[in-house]
């Protein structure tokens, strides 16, 4: 499951190269510059992680819907398949005699 999430996160990064760019230019706040730079970096990382999390969640929801649809189609196909060579012959007369 962790591998799937890593792959989905990688796909999200590849599909949206401009989604992680800052919307506003970086303007340092007044006060202690070392503390504000660290805080700004922390906030920027958090906002990027929020975007990645949202993208991964949407991708997972989309993939769940696709898998559900594919499973529905497979079930429908399984019900419509003719019996195979090793399938039991249906007892049409209902007498339970399986000699044939």
Swiss-Prot record:
Main location: secreted
Coiled-coil regions, chain positions: 54-81
Signal peptide start and end residues: 1-21
Record localization: Secreted
Keywords: Coiled coil, Secreted, Signal
GO cellular component: extracellular region
Superkingdom to which the source organism belongs: Eukaryota
UniProt record similarity statement: Belongs to the PLAC9 family.
Protein name as annotated: Placenta-specific protein 9
Native source organism of the sequence: Bos taurus (Bovine)
């Amino acid at each position: 499951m962790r591998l799937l999430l890593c792959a989905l996160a990688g796909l999200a990064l590849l599909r949206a190269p401009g989604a992680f760019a800052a919307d506003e230019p970086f303007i340092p706040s007044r006060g202690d510059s070392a503390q504000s730079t660290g805080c700004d970096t922390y906030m920027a990382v958090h906002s990027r992680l929020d975007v990645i999390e949202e993208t991964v969640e949407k991708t997972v929801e989309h993939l769940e819907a696709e898998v559900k649809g594919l499973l529905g189609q497979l079930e429908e196909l399984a019900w419509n398949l003719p019996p195979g060579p090793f399938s039991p012959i249906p007892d049409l007369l209902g007498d339970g005699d399986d000699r044939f």
